[in-house]
């Protein structure tokens, strides 16, 4: 990815807002704008840092993943697990995150962690899969090569939930609905069970909560829809880390858009539904 910055081509916005930033301006920027506006002491790293610098994850009290964070290496996953087990809290303010396994390999010039390719998923291997489906053919520079599917651990065992859709795409929109109003997550929001934050869910989401994780709680849940037709059931979760730390999974890419709308920012829309912009309840939940 020697040229990683380009127009975000997915039709999430009719007016493209990435401005050559990849996905930073649509998703990460509203989050960082809000965090710094409120004086949080934050540092910034890339996926390459998460892959190559596990010790760096231990410098902070919390690790935050934002927006559309779909592509991870196996080492990124293991480093995040080790950080969690060392007492670092994790927050996944995104949807369809930690889905595709992408090894990081050196470039032809020998620069480490410079080439990526999608080889598999952070999902259980399907029980019934043909030998042909186990192999993918790719073009790499001028040569073709086969490789076995590189399946990672279940992403839900890290995040608390993961993509869970029959079509395997995890797309859909909806309202983000409170399930446990007396949970500390909702302190100061005034939300009651069944209260919803309209159009906060989109355009991809998480479900399949890993109920075996310690202290696992589904704090918000509801239906994801496309054109008003149910396509799945999302679940936002909180579970306990081993050292009084926590792991939160917001289950929606659009979470950061509920925090702030920086100058020039355009709210995302998909499937005929537009995210509503900043919401005091989203802000309070994130403070909590």
Predicted segments, located by residue:
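Conserved anion/nucleotide-ligand pocket segment
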Residues: 134-191
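Short alpha-beta junction capping motif
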Residues: 57-105
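Loop/turn elements at helix/coil->beta-strand transitions in domains of secreted/extracellular proteins
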Residues: 37-43, 58-62, 85-90, 214-215, ...
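Extracellular ligand-binding/catalytic regions of CAZymes and related secreted enzymes
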Residues: 1-18, 38, 102-118, 168-288
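Aromatic-Pro/Gly-enriched surface loop or interdomain linker
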Residues: 1-56
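The substrate-binding groove and active-site-proximal loops of carbohydrate-active enzymes
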Residues: 14-24, 59-73, 271-279
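Acidic, Ser/Thr-rich peripheral helices and adjacent loops at domain boundaries
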Residues: 108-139
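Solvent-exposed loop/turn segments at secondary-structure junctions
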Residues: 49-52, 68-72, 96-100, 106, ...
